[in-house]
């Protein structure tokens, strides 16, 4: 993928850098694999704000992406690569030999016309899905299951990947982008390759409006609020908050660990925090 730069005919175009998507399909998504999506504006079923700084944005329709790859042993051909407004990665429309259509996350180096398959013993090439226990050590993978049959949960964002660095006793060791190393069952499925659109990390919106198009509202600092709204609020003139950084609910932020799932601690061999010491 390449970047697109613009002549600064307007101030918002001067710093604008976006990913060139000219290689993607320009038509509509497959209707049978698409559903309507209503905007929540960060509100729950009571109408109360549960996710701040969300709302507005362009209307979207949801694409059903197959994260499980349950159709095993059947070859599929890549029909086209598409843009998906609901995620940073691109998606690929594939057609199985029996005619069924499906969307999957598009990995890097997957092109239109390529043939892919999911199964127990398949070639190690981008787009193919197989159990982790059958992959060679060192394989770059994405869309990794954490529980067999649950569907991929790890490494689904643009440009992300995990690496299989070891195995033993029915488990495999994965190294994640964060530096964490964790054990996962060898019967969990994953897809070979890294996720498409790695240049997403280098885009520059150029203006606030582009964030608004995505449904992102301005992120207001606590020190700019009143005392009723935030622990850092209030004070005469500009203040620094007067205490260690906290959330609007008084919880310590900037580094405090919040993980509380002790049942799965035994699967984490090397935490992401150890890398920073």
Curated annotation (Swiss-Prot):
Recall the GO molecular function terms of this protein's record: rRNA binding; structural constituent of ribosome; transferase activity
Q: Which GO terms describe its biological process?
A: cytoplasmic translation
Task: List where this protein forms a coiled coil.
Answer: none
Gene3D superfamilies cross-referenced by the UniProt entry: 2.30.30.30, Nucleic acid-binding proteins, Ribosomal protein L2, domain 3
User: Which keywords does UniProt give here?
Assistant: Ribonucleoprotein, Ribosomal protein, RNA-binding, rRNA-binding
Per the UniProt record, one Pfam family is: Ribosomal_L2_C
**Which parts of the sequence are annotated with region: Disordered?**
222-277
Instruction: Tell me a GO cellular component.
Output: large ribosomal subunit
Give the highest taxon in the source lineage.
Bacteria
What is the similarity comment for this entry? Belongs to the universal ribosomal protein uL2 family.
Q: Subunit notes for this chain? A: Part of the 50S ribosomal subunit. Forms a bridge to the 30S subunit in the 70S ribosome.
Q: Report the protein's function.
A: One of the primary rRNA binding proteins. Required for association of the 30S and 50S subunits to form the 70S ribosome, for tRNA binding and peptide bond formation. It has been suggested to have peptidyltransferase activity; this is somewhat controversial. Makes several contacts with the 16S rRNA in the 70S ribosome.
Q: Which NCBIfam families match?
A: rplB_bact
What PANTHER family does this protein map onto?
LARGE RIBOSOMAL SUBUNIT PROTEIN UL2M, RIBOSOMAL PROTEIN L2
What HAMAP family does the record tag this protein with? Answer: Ribosomal_uL2_B (MF_01320_B)
Specify the protein name: Large ribosomal subunit protein uL2
Q: Which gene encodes it?
A: rplB
């Amino acid at each position: 993928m390449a970047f697109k730069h613009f002549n600064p005919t307007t101030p918002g175009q001067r710093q604008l850098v976006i990913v060139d998507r000219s290689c993607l399909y320009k038509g509509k998504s497959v209707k049978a694999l698409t559903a309507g999506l209503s905007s929540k504006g960060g509100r729950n079923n009571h109408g109360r704000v549960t996710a701040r700084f969300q709302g507005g944005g362009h209307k979207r329709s949801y694409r059903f992406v197959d994260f499980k790859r349950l159709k095993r042993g059947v070859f599929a051909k890549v029909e086209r690569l598409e843009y998906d407004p609901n995620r940073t990665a691109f998606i690929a429309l594939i057609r199985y030999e029996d005619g069924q259509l499906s969307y999957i996350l598009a990995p890097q180096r997957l092109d239109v016309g390529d043939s892919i398959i999911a199964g127990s013993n398949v070639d190690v090439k981008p787009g193919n899905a197989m159990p982790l226990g059958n992959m060679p050590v060192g394989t770059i993978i994405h869309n990794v299951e954490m529980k067999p049959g649950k569907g991929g949960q790890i490494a689904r964002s643009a440009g992300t990947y995990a690496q299989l660095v070891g195995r033993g006793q029915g488990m495999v060791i994965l190294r994640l982008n964060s530096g964490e190393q964790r054990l996962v069952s060898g019967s969990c499925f994953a897809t070979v390759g890294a996720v498409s659109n790695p240049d997403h990390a280098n885009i520059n919106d150029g203006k606030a409006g582009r964030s608004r198009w995505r449904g992102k509202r301005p992120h207001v600092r606590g020190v700019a609020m009143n005392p009723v709204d935030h622990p850092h609020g209030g004070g005469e003139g500009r203040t620094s908050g007067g205490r260690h950084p906290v959330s609007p609910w008084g919880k310590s932020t900037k580094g405090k660990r919040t993980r509380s799932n002790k049942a799965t601690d035994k699967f984490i061999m090397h935490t992401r925090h150890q890398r920073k010491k």
